[in-house]
Structures are given as C-alpha cells and as structure tokens.
Amino acid sequence: MLKIAVDAMGGDFAPEVNILGAYEVVQDIEVEIILVGDEKKIKSFLPEKKETKGIISVIPADDVIQMDENISSALRRKNTSMRKAVELVKAGKADAVISAGHSGAMMALSFLLLGKLPNVERPAIATVMPCLKGHFILLDAGANVDCKPEHLVQFAFMGEAYHKALFNSQSPKIALLSIGEEGSKGNELTKEAFKLLKSSRLNFVGNIEGKDIFFGQADVVVCDGFVGNIVLKVGEGLAEALMKMLKREIADIITGKLGYMMIKPAIKSFRKKVDYSEYGGALLLGINGTSIICHGRSSAKAIKNAIKVATEMVKKQIYTRISESLNQTEERDESQNSVNRLLCS
C-alpha cells in the first residue's frame, strides 16, 4: 500500500480541510495517509471510524511554518509539520509528500532534503491548466524567477515526461511562451531558448503567445517562473471573475432565473473545468521524489485530488521517467560533441 505524507497544518484552512480531504481519499482508494502536525487537533477533526479502503495514521509535530514567514527562518526549525512530512519521503517511510502551506518553504525543503535528479540544474513547478482541447501543462509556474535558456530546455524535457505519464501521450507538443510566434521575437532568454529547443529532439512547435495558450495549440507551455506564476494567477482570477460576471448578468434580466435553470448544467461543467481544486496541486519536477505543492486556500476536494495525483505519479514513477529522459538527452549531446570534435580535428 502506498504511503502519502500530508502536512496537516499547511494552508489557510488547515488542519480541517487536509484531514477531511485525506478521509475522503481513504474511502475511495487503498492508500495510507500520514497526517503530520498537531496530534490533538488532527484527531479532533477526524470523523468517527468506519470501514474504509485505506488507512490514516498520525505523526506529531508541534511547530508550523506560517504563510508569511521568512524562508530562511522556516528552514532552520527542525520540528515543523512540513519538514517532518518531507523527511518521511527522504527516509523511505512515505512515497510522496503534499502541502498547502508556504510554497517557497515547501520547494526549499524538497530541494534540500530530497535532492535533485541527476543532470537537473533547476527544479520546476508544473501545473495542469484547462484549455479548449482538454488540458495543458505550464512550467515553470513559480520556482525560478530568473532563468537561463538551458533551464527552459530542461523544463521542456521534464514537461514532456510529465505529460506522457499523466495523459499517456506519445509526442506532446512543446511551445515556448513569448510575445510573438517568430523565433526572433522576445527577450534574449526566449530567443536563445527558441534556438536550443528547435535543435532538440522534442516535438517543438515554436513560440506561443499568451492569447493562444488556452486554445490547446500546445500540450506543454514553457516559461520562466516569474512569467509562469503571473499566467497561473491571472488564469485563476479571470475564471473566478467570469463566473461572477455571468451570474450577475443572468440576475439582471427578467428571465434570469428561468434562463439560469436552463443553462445550469453548462455552468456547472464550466466551473468544474476551471476550478483549481479539480487538479489537486502542482508537481515539483526535477526532485528525487514526489512532492506536490497545493494552493494555500485549498479545499478538502483539492487535497483529496492532490493525494490521488500523488499516488498516480508514484505508480507511474514520474521522477524516474524524467531522469531517464534527461540522461538520454545528455548522452545525445555528448555523442554529438564527440562527432564535432572528430570533424574539427
């Protein structure tokens, strides 16, 4: 049975939503959820015991990393719920870790305790986003605000491996987010990254503009973490605003209530597609383990779905796939360099 460590104290609505999300999961699938945090509070929120497919255990931790806390001070404390949850993966006592707490601290702890995969220069946050054709993966969504062209290329390879594992795709289309479709447009980072991606083995379809990413023209959209996080937050805010505007417009017309009843199924379907809680959390790629960062205001449903994503990624050995993909790329590059040296000698 897989074991998933959950930082029970992380997030705006902790520990209740983390505990309820875990409880909902063990009713559906065979998995052990290890809740890490204030034991007394955790047990007070656990529903009465009944027969479930999975099990829930508790590991006490008497310290919590606050959402507005300085990362360096958070890392120095050894008994936080987040740190102890990540340490379970490091010790082999859990197969994956999930937290809706301080995202910067979660990234740093995952990086420091679990380490990077071989040949990975920078881990990246990969998030699944909705589009007209289903879903696409955006990375980096906030781990690295300053990048080199080579980092974006690695993000692309990691994103490809993630897409293949998540959606069973064969050759996902990779695009570089920029201000124009032409390779000559953008800043120095994107122009150089365009050249490198074009010469790679990836199914690189070129640059993609911000207005096109939600139309499904690419399966994986690559950018630095500064741009990616803005795209993510704009997408979330726009979806919420559109839902509110639609409800207001319906309420303002005489036949609003009747009209709403007629289109209610469509609105419900749309809300589900753009609701971040449906996707659980964002996977930290490039780490030697499965680490998922959830939204700070995650609901019980978001935590439940994040746990399910974690179990799927462990079963599909996502970090092994990423490592193999990058190793193959490294071998090709070394082989090509050897050929070039021979030609020049």
UniProtKB/Swiss-Prot annotation:
Keywords: Cytoplasm, Lipid biosynthesis, Lipid metabolism, Phospholipid biosynthesis, Phospholipid metabolism, Transferase. The keyword Transferase applies. One of its GO terms (biological process) is fatty acid biosynthetic process. GO terms for molecular function: phosphate:acyl-[acyl carrier protein] acyltransferase activity. Pathway: Lipid metabolism; phospholipid metabolism. Gene3D superfamilies: Isopropylmalate Dehydrogenase. This is Phosphate acyltransferase. The lineage of its organism: Bacteria, Pseudomonadati, Nitrospirota, Thermodesulfovibrionia, Thermodesulfovibrionales.
